Structures are given as C-alpha cells and as structure tokens.
From Swiss-Prot:
Pfam families: COX2. Keywords: Cell membrane, Copper, Electron transport, Heme, Iron, Membrane, Metal-binding, Translocase, Transmembrane, Transmembrane helix, Transport. It catalyses: 4 Fe(II)-[cytochrome c] + O2 + 8 H(+)(in) = 4 Fe(III)-[cytochrome c] + 2 H2O + 4 H(+)(out). It is found in: Cell membrane. Residues 1-40, 105-277 are periplasmic. GO terms for cellular component: plasma membrane. Its EC number is 7.1.1.9. This is Alternative cytochrome c oxidase subunit 2. Belongs to the cytochrome c oxidase subunit 2 family. It comes from Bradyrhizobium diazoefficiens (strain JCM 10833 / BCRC 13528 / IAM 13628 / NBRC 14792 / USDA 110).
C-alpha cells in the first residue's frame, strides 16, 4: 500500500512541478516559436505516457499485492495487448516526430532575402563578419587564417574588402530582417547559443554550418558557448544587440572594414584568466 501511494505521489508531483515550475523558457526573441511548440508536444505526449505507466504500476501494486493462497496466473503472451501497445507506441512516436520534421524543414530553408552573417568560434572568443555596402560576404579559407587575418578572408576577393570584421566584440542585428548565420570554428567544437533565439547549431572545424533567424524583439541578449571547448569555456561570452534598422546601419557605418584592418600588425586575442590577476 505504501509503495502504491509513493508511486501516486511521484506521478502527481512530477506533473505539478512541470506545470508550475519557476524554471521555464526565456521570452522568445525570434521567429522560432515553432521550436517551443514541438517541445511542448513532446512534453505532453511523454508526460501522458509517464503518468499512465506510474498510475498503472500503483494500481497493480495495490490490486495484486501478496495474499496468502493467491497464485499468479502465467500468461506467456497476449497478442491483443501486444497489438495495442505497438499501435499506441507508433502513434506516439509519429506524433512527436512529424511536427519536428516540419519545423526542421523550415529551419534549414533559408529565405531568399536573408542577409548572411558569419560567426567564428575559437578558444576562447567569438568573431563576427557582416557584409558591407555591397550586401554580400567575401570568400574565405582556413588556410588564410593568420594573426593579421583571423577569419581567413581572401585578400583578392573584392567582395570581402568592405566586410565588417568584429573580434571579441558584440554583434548587432536589425529587427524584422531574416539573417542566415554561417558558423565556423578554428580549433575545436563550439556552439553559438542565444537562449532567446531558440535556434543553435554546432560549429565544426573544417565545416560551415548554418541556421537562420528573424529577430522579432529588440534588446541585448547574452551569447553562450553550448559545447564544452576547453579550460576557459566559461569565458566565451558576447552580446547580440537587436535594434531598429536605422540604428543598425548607423552602427555599421562606424565599424572598420577588412580593408581597413588588414594592414595592422597585431590582433587582440582573448586570454585565459587564471584568477591570479
């Protein structure tokens, strides 16, 4: 009886904790509310199954507890029950998988009018590259990476000369405009993650991965690295500032281009803070 009561309390407590938990999503700041919807669908389906299984276990513990003289019935198979379980499991998996596939298709289908922005991760800083007045990014190659050219831009590509390069600073984006985020890594796995954006993707050395977003709320948002990348992983912080388009262009006008930076002799790098400073 006590075991049945404990199981019942676990089921009720788990559901109540989920419904009234103080730890919930941050307010969304992009178009990816669909991702929240798919997570909610998964929570409801798995929560229903969890509750049903726990309540069934509690019922069995109470209904079929040990009694003197009672003998358990031996039933090696039950085809009817097996069919019901198979169909129910299939429906549940399909109900979770189908919305995810629909959202994934939207996630990787970038609008034709999206502006490309490149983000590079390295131990332990973020670098950003935005298109200049020509509206397109120049080509790049990892073989071009050097202290004077940390993002590996092709110096002979005219489209890259007006690219805006920001090292270890903040990224600005205009509100309401689709942005294709190109992701690269210099050294190890990183993951550019802004909780309010919902969208994220691993950054893999030697590959260019991507996702796209449309910011729907102005504000300043924290950037985190969601992939353990070394001793100073915690230092991979930055800000994304979503602002009105006029403010964005005013900020962009104040930034230095690759052509203006390529002649310098030194580049400021992120340093590991040992705690002795």
């Amino acid at each position: 009886m006590a075991v049945a009561l404990i199981l019942l309390l676990i089921a009720i407590g788990s559901v109540l904790f989920h419904l009234f938990s103080p730890w919930w999503w941050t307010p969304i700041a992009t178009n990816w509310g669909y991702i929240d919807d798919t997570i909610n669908i998964t929570f409801w389906i798995t929560g229903f199954v969890f509750t049903a299984v726990i309540l069934f276990m509690a019922y069995c513990v109470f209904r079929f507890h040990h009694k003197e003289g009672r003998q358990a019935a031996y039933n090696p198979e039950n085809k009817k029950l097996e069919w019901w379980l198979s169909v129910g499991t299939g429906v549940g998996v399909a109900a979770m998988l189908a919305p995810g596939l629909v959202v994934w298709h939207q996630f990787v289908t970038v609008p034709a009018d999206a502006t490309e922005v490149e983000i590079m991760g390295q131990q332990w800083q973020w670098s950003f590259r935005l298109p200049g007045k020509d509206g397109r990014l120049g080509t790049s190659d990892v073989r071009n990476i050097s202290p004077e050219n940390p993002m590996g831009l092709n110096r002979d590509d005219p489209h890259g000369q007006d690219d805006v390069v920001i090292e270890n600073g903040d990224l600005h984006l205009p509100i309401g405009k689709p942005v294709k985020v190109l992701l690269r890594s210099v050294d190890v796995l990183h993951d550019f993650y802004v909780p309010e954006f919902r969208a994220k993707m691993d950054m893999v050395p030697g590959m260019v991965t991507y996702f796209w977003i449309r910011p729907i709320r102005t504000g300043t948002f924290d950037v985190l690295c969601a992939e353990l990348c070394g001793a100073a992983h915690y230092q991979m912080r930055a800000k994304v500032i979503v602002e009105a388009e006029s403010d964005y262009h005013a900020w962009l006008e104040q930034q230095k281009t690759f052509a203006g930076l390529s002649g310098r002799n030194a580049v400021v790098r992120a340093k590991y803070n040992s705690g002795d400073d």
